[in-house]
């Protein structure tokens, strides 16, 4: 079954499903360990170990007050700006758990787990608890599949209409990944409450489901589905979807080793070794899945890193999902400093886009570097700038300064562009941090 992530906007992505089972783990040193033990993993040399986060804007001469004002203004515009031209966050009444709000893809008139989880992450990082809780309440109320007989039980419908009606009843793992991480950070920053606001319990439950959900078949509003877990145990990678019929490949932009390292420390104990190994696998996968000259990754890839063609024309090229991949490896370098190849990858992709022209590069390319679509998208401007966290070449400063001068996205495409703009600004200013439990 095929379902498109976008219809009217230029951003499209095919979704459906997958499965597998859990195995025993081996420590990197070669010694066998019980799955109930916390793995002995290095803390690396990044912000997790040092507690220090670079502010690249200040490094380039912008005052701390300027940086804070710029980020605060972006949050205000995207969350509380003009509802027709600026905002993507909308309040939606109350229920027994309190206020409700959704974050919408304005061009497609829906709410997605991707955007809802991004909104929660941005809110916990910037200490906006009311918005965080309202988004989580809406996600649990309308997106969460609580029927134990439903094939997607325990997951979230990846897309709903803004009235809460599902557009599909299957999951997109990038949403679950960001939900889990945002909930752990909320627990660390604000403390857990009761019910759906017991952030740690909710994160633990969802992370367990992602790895261990048994295969289930059944009916949905959109036809029969067979759904399993969201990871491939053999390859130790996140799947594109948890459906059995479409679960044999991955999406490079779903790979979040910076998060997996934290789950290897804070997640359910029996799964910590798996996430420690998954982090290392993803670091190697970034190299395998990117072109050795351009640094471009495909939207979808096989587990060996080769591009994965599907009926979606963007599957095997650098397209909308792919924008995020460089940001993922660069944040991993910033937080952990364990994989020097990530620095090479950042230099490589920035060299490619610099050659295209910082003020005019397109937003879709073949992996070899032939332009497919010429729209100059703020979201890609943002993630290319975030690559500067790992870059070594002086050109990285030009990418940072270009983002600094770029206005907050508005208009029809403000959802995806806006979320990537907001998070990249936070990464580059040192305001996207690890909130560790006390």
Model-identified regions with their sequence ranges:
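Alpha-helical support elements that line or immediately flank enzyme active sites
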Residues: 120-129, 139
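Bacterial N-terminal signal peptides
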Residues: 18-30
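C-terminal functional modules
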Residues: 362-438
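Aromatic-rich carbohydrate-recognition surfaces in CAZymes
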Residues: 109-119, 164-191
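Sec/Tat signal peptide C-region and signal peptidase I cleavage site
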Residues: 32-36
């Amino acid at each position: 079954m095929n379902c498109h992530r976008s219809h009217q906007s230029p951003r499209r992505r095919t979704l459906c499903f997958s499965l597998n089972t859990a195995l025993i783990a081996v420590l990197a040193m070669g010694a066998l360990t019980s799955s109930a033990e916390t793995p002995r993993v290095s803390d690396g040399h990044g912000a997790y170990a040092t507690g220090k986060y670079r502010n690249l804007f200040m490094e380039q001469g912008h005052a701390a007050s300027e940086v804070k004002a710029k980020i605060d203004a972006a949050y205000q515009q995207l969350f509380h700006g003009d509802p027709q031209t600026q905002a993507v966050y909308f309040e939606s009444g109350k229920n027994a758990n309190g206020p409700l709000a959704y974050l919408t893809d304005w061009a497609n008139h829906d709410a997605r787990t991707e955007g809802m989880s991004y909104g929660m992450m941005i809110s916990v990082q910037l200490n906006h608890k009311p918005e965080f809780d309202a988004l989580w309440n809406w996600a649990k109320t309308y997106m969460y599949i609580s029927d134990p007989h439903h094939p997607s039980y325990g997951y979230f419908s990846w897309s709903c209409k803004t009235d809460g009606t599902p557009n599909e009843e299957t999951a997109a793992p990038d949403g679950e990944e960001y939900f889990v991480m945002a909930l752990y950070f909320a627990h660390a920053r604000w403390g857990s409450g009761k019910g759906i606001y017991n952030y740690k319990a909710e994160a633990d439950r969802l992370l367990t489901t992602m790895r261990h959900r048994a295969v289930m078949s059944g009916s949905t509003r959109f036809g029969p589905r067979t759904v399993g877990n969201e990871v491939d145990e053999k390859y130790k990678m996140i799947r594109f979807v948890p459906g059995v019929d479409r679960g044999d490949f991955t999406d490079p932009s779903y790979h979040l080793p910076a998060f997996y390292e934290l789950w290897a420390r804070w997640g359910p104990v029996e799964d910590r070794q798996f996430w420690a190994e998954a982090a290392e696998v993803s670091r190697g996968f970034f190299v395998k899945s990117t072109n050795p000259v351009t640094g471009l990754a495909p939207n979808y890839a096989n587990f060996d890193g080769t591009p994965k063609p599907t009926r979606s024309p963007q599957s095997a090229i650098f397209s909308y999902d792919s924008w995020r991949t460089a940001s993922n490896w660069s944040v991993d370098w910033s937080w952990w400093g364990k994989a020097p190849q990530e620095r090479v990858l950042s230099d490589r992709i920035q060299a490619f886009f610099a050659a295209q022209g910082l003020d005019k590069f397109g937003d879709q390319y073949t992996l070899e570097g032939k332009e497919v679509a010429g729209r100059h998208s703020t979201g890609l401007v943002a993630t290319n700038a975030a690559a500067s966290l790992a870059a070594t070449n002086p050109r990285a400063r030009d990418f940072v300064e270009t983002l600094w001068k770029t206005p907050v996205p508005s208009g029809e495409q403000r959802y995806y562009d806006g979320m990537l703009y907001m998070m990249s600004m936070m990464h580059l200013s040192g305001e996207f941090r690890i909130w560790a439990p006390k």
